[in-house]
Amino acid sequence: MKIHDILFGSKQKSILKTIEEGNLDELKIFLKNVGDVNEKYDNKSLLHLAIDNCQNNYFGVIELLINNGADINSYQSYLKETPLHRICARAKPKIDVVGLLLDRGAKVNAEDISSKTPVFHCSFNYSVELLNLLVKYGADIKHTDKYNNTLLHDDYLNCNTETFEDFVKVLISLGFNINSKNNEGHTPLYLCQNKDIEDILIKYDGKIS
């Protein structure tokens, strides 16, 4: 991509392509000449775009944006998700980048439109490493969303059973109640649609009601 295209082309298309490619040189030119690193593109900040779309130089791109003033706690306007929400929702979260965001001041208990905090998004991966890192920075594992769901009230349809069991064991060791009920009086086991996960919840004294 030519410098002229970065600066004067279709802004949304050009910067998104630069971020997708992880082209640090082009991104530096963009940041130097365009100005507002926190301008929104399709309701997403550049930091949100990088977390969701960057294919190369992942850590470097995100660090560069932060070093140039990207708002670590900015919201997507429609879901109110912060960058930390988005990276925790990755199937394979980048732990080094999660640590970077937390070190630079990301709010570990920021709430999205449903009052879910980033730790809720561990349900996309059930990473014990991610859970422990969030807890280290003060994540409240007992937090509930606006429907009183806990982070275990989920359908588990795509859940890895081995990862899930390790995740549950850590939660229990931290004092988490796997039989918490939401506003409809349902426990995680009641909502579970995955037989293997049901067996794990029952193994750790999960109750239907």
Predicted regions span which residues?
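Ankyrin repeat A-helix N-terminal signature
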Residues: K17-G22, L49-Y58, R86-K94, H121-S127, ...
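Ankyrin repeat domain, specifically the short helix-to-loop turn at the C-terminus of the second helix
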Residues: K28-D36, E63-D71, G99-K107, N132-D140, ...
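Intrinsically disordered, low-complexity regulatory segments in ankyrin-centric signaling systems
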Residues: M1-N33, N38-Q55, F59, E63, ...
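Alpha-solenoid repeat scaffolds
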Residues: V37, N53, N57, I72, ...
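Ankyrin-repeat boundary/"N-cap" motif
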Residues: F8-I15, E39-D52, Y75-C88, E111-T117, ...
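Eukaryotic tandem repeat interaction scaffolds
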Residues: E111-Y147
